Amino acid sequence: MHRDMYSSRGTGYGQQQYGSQSGYSQNLGSGYPGSSVSGGAEGGSQISLSSRHPSITGAPQETDIGGGYRSHLSTAASHYGTQYGSVYGSTSLSSSQPLSTNGLGSSVLDNRSGYVPTLPDSPKFASGSYLSPSSHGYGQKTDDLYSDKLSGYIPVDRRQYGEQSSSYLGRELQNEPTRRYADPSNFARQTDLYDRIDQASLLRGEQLLKMQSLHTSSVDAGVNRQTDYLTERSSTVRHSDQEAMHYGGRLESDPHGLSVRNTSSYASQHTPSLLGAVPRRNLDDYIYPESSSNPGYGVSLPPGRDYGTGKGIHSAASLDLDYPGGMLARGTGAAPRVDDLRKGDRASYLREFDLREEERRREDQRARDKEREREREREHDRERERQRERERQRARDRERERILERREKERQGERERERKRALEIKRDRTPTARATSKDTKERTPVPKSISRDARSSSLRRDAHHREASIRRSSPIKPIRRDYVCKVLSSRLVDMERDYVTLDKRYPRLFVPSEFSKVVVNWPKQKLTLSMHTAVSFEHDYIEDGGADVKSTSTKPLALKTGGKSVWNAKMVLMSGLSRTALEDLASDKFFEDRIPHICNILKFAVLKKDHSFMAIGGSWDPTDGMDPSVDQSSLIQTMLRHSKDKLHLDLSNCRHWNPFLEIHYDRVGTDGVFSYKEITVLFVPDLSECLPSFDVWRTQWLAHRKALTERDRLLSQEVKKDTVEVTKDAEKKSPGDTSGTPTTGTKKTVKKIIKRVVKRPVNDGKATGMKGEKSDVPEHVAIPETTVPKEESTGTSSNKKIVKKVAETGDTSDPSAKANEQTPAKTIVKKKIIKRVAKRKVAEIDNKMDGDSKKDGDSDEKKVMEVGKKSSDSGSVEMKPTAESLEDVKDENASKTVDVKQETGSPDTKKKEGASSSSKKDTKTGEDKKAEKKNNSETMSEGKKIDRNNTDEKEVKEKVTEKEIKERGGKDESRIQVKDRKKCEEPPRAGFILQTKRNKDSKLRSLSASLDSLLDYTDKDLDESSFEISLFAESLYEMLQYQMGSRIFEFLKKLRVKIVRQRNQRKRHQEELSVKQNEAKSQDKRQKTAEHEDKEASVISESAPGKDDKETSGKETVDGSREIADKEAVAKTKETLGSKEVTVGEAVNMEVENQDEEDDDGDDDPEEDPEEDPEEDPEEDPEEDPEECEEMDVANTEQEEPAEEPQKKEENLEKTSGTVADPITEAETDNRKEERGPNDSKTEIKPKSETEKHGKQDGGTSDAAKREETVDKELLQAFRFFDRNQAGYVRVEDMRVTIHSLGKFLSHREVKELVQSALLESNTGRDDRILYNKLVRLSL
């Protein structure tokens, strides 16, 4: 039974062979004519299997086969009339292409409304891979297809298929029993289907023949995939309402009990793929499922062979994974359950989805890891960069610290040297320990007979020692200053500048938001500024009781005038450079404290309110004149009005006002819209025209000083009254004890008040003389109550002055006030005064060194020391003993007339001596010594007339002041003294007195500020007044830079012409030297030949026969031959010299002509010369020849030697020839010297330097050389304008920027050549520093 059922020659379900089936035999016969139906069935099945499954042979053939089938999908599907139609219909053939391309098409069932898939598709084989999109909609065209070709087939053969087809057509609808069987009338319309099947079979046969040659591999590899196809069909093609069976009617509870021998249903199976229907499956499909041994498509494979295991793309194991539940493994045993299929597909889909999700998560994780790695790398890079930056910052800090330490060491060394010098000077003055000792045995007396000589010798010894100490001190090593050069890189001659330009030019300048533009007037019109007129400004104030009248706002003024512009007129008063300042700018002195520069010499008078500078002036008023937009002369009236009102200054005599700047503002109203335009014009008047004469200025200045003195005196009296009241209150609070120590509170108040008192009387001392009040000094020294607190409170700066003032103000103050001025602070100061007296007294007695006064000096010394001890131990009680001790000292010293004569002298001379000895740089000359001797002699003669008490008091006073000078440092005090004396005695140069109004509300004051001070602004200066002053300072600095840069530019043009000319002359000179050397060599050869001929002739004459005849004839022949040789040599030398003269004369003429042409060209157009000359001589570029400057700086000795060699040779020729040179040769030598003159211009400086070195031997020559060496002071000032610290050089890059900023529109090559010429002339080409000290000494 099973053999019949599973026959190898029949179908897998007991069907007949292919030849017994009517539908397939017809199709097969038409596809394969001439072949036996029974014999060729198996072979045909094998061939068609490989051809119908192109996916078995692999991917390359799969794509070709799929491409061949694309156009014949519908026709090829009709070839299979039997059960193959459900498998190899349009779905199976179209599955080759989606498999090879991973097709994503949706299932046909998804596009139909009647069939909704209940099981999910396989993740690897989508539903669109098995169903062709061409099978859409199928039941509607069956009538049309069957009605055409019905008569072409036998009705008996069609009946069984039609009946079976009708049953299937009935099942296409919903599950209704009434529609199970279709109407038999439809069977008559199915004839057209078979015609189409015939045509498709023919085409299919042709395709199989074509594919047979391509497919030679076994069919076994595709069984696995075919099984996959069939399993997918069984799992997916099912309606949602149906049960486990597909299209086969309802099943019973036991599907295995059904009959399985109904072969008629299989024989008459239709092809629904042509109509687009879903392939129907029978019940046997589930009872006998497909497997590797039973494919299920009508043919059984040979026994013993399993073509599905381990072959194909997907093996059975992989299919088991794709379809879980062991469906393929149970394929031969029993039919799979639907629930298993459903669960297996869902599980596989979920597993595949999880795998894909996991893979996607891994990819995302890897991407995030990579991104984190990149971020870490970037962070590492940033960290390394930060580390490098920190290292660089540390290096910079270390370098800065090293620089600061080096500077600190230099300052410390300087202070140490200063201290050593001060100690040396002090050592010269202070007595020895032996002289100051108290023991009388140690002090050896000086004999009376030699006391006067000893004193004179000691004076001489002291003076000599002082001079030696000054001469012994080594000169101060100049401090090496840093190079500072401020050069603006922008174009200086731009007239109008907007907000962006200002922000770029001046980064530190705060520009107001309403600023629109600024117009600079100095580039377009020549301004007459008082640059060389020094003006002195005296600043004062006037008390104004009224309140400060605020100026009216500018906006109502603009509305009142009816215009849209508001004008402001302001000015800045400038003090120019004096003669001494100009000399300092061009001098070679070394300045320690303050380096002179134009920016710190120029002074400007401005106003200051709070912390901001203001220009002098205000807004324009219609009363000043016409509208400034029509006539700007009305602005001058505005300035005159404001200067009188604010400064009490009359400038009506000024003629040149010089409008310097115009600053424009666009004012915005409260509504945020443009309201009006405001224009501020800044003037710099020329004050040289309106300066008063010196006599008028002297009277004005003296009256002003007198008024100041009177005002200060009144203030001092008021303050004294306040101090008396304060001291009385303090005495009431603290009862008078024996110690007399004041409280801290009273001491502080007294100190504060006394400071003011001390500062005011300085003017009294300046205004009044000192000579008339010298006689009153003892009284005030004897009663030091008024002077004591002043000296104690002033500290360090004005102690010496106060001592003077006591003598001056003593007459004006009342004696009652003196008596009442006993303050508690007097005790502290008395100690110091007594100590000073004691010390100076000891020094005085020791310096006298008088042997007769030994005992008296000892007693005096003891008394003074006792006084000092008592004063240090006790308090105010010891005031009386101090006065008595002073009187005793005076009485005991009255008998010492010699000592008085020695010591008494004018206090002025002694002060001068102290000041000169304390200062470091002042040296005593012979005149000072003579003056000292005269003063000593005068004091010797006048000493008897002077009262002893007065002289002693003067000595005490002077010694106290000298001690104070020593404590404070004599250098600074002497300078201050000299300045104060000059201020007191002589008025400064002519100028103006600026008096501002002062009241409680106003803080406005006038002051003088340098250009550096005006340029020292910051971005925190937000006022418009500060902005205007700062902008004025920057514009003025640009004007100065333009002027100084123009000087340097003109000099560089001349220097360039000179260097090019010297280079051309040097080339010609070298060519001439080479020609002359060649001629000299040829001349030497001719001379040697002539001498050789002479020797031969003499030998021939000596070898003649006969002694007498030989001698006579020999002498004659020798003489004759010599005369002939001499004549020939002279002729030859004349010829050669003539030829030389001709050639050299022509060369000289050519040089003179070329030089004249060059001079003409240089005079006509000197700017073109630097460009043309390098083109004529491109070989010797200054950058390629850096050693030329060294030759020109030192001496051009290498050129002198070859120049002198031909001259020496010519002289030798003249000596040998015995002839005298013609005048032409002398002219030639003169011309040659003239030629060498401009070439060796630098060589003329060498003898000067040599004579300077040997100046001791030849003093006159060195002085003459110094006189001849001139310095261009204007050029030196220009260079030093850019070299702020006088380092001695200017860098090449700064010089290039300077020339570019002049606005001359020069090319970079021109500027480079100009600067390079200066570099090579002053320094080597390997350096970038132009040493301008050499350039200013050149004569161009």
From Swiss-Prot:
Please give an example of a GO cellular component term from this record: nucleus
Domain EF-hand stretches: 1270-1305
Biased segments, Acidic residues type:
1153-1204
For bias kind Polar residues, which ranges apply? 46-60, 810-824
**The entry's keywords:** Calcium, Coiled coil, Nucleus, Stress response, Transit peptide
Regions of compositional bias (Low complexity) in chain numbering? 7-39
Summed up, the tissue specificity of this protein is: Expressed ubiquitously at high levels, including in guard cells.
User: What triggers its expression?
Assistant: Slightly induced by salt (NaCl) stress.
Please list where the region (Disordered) is annotated. 1-73, 161-185, 357-473, 723-750, 784-990, 1063-1269
Q: How does it assemble?
A: Interacts with BHLH148/RITF1.
Name of this protein: Protein SHORT ROOT IN SALT MEDIUM 1
Mind giving the lineage of the organism this protein is from? Eukaryota, Viridiplantae, Streptophyta, Embryophyta, Tracheophyta
Q: Per UniProt, what is the name of the gene that codes for the protein in this document?
A: RSA1
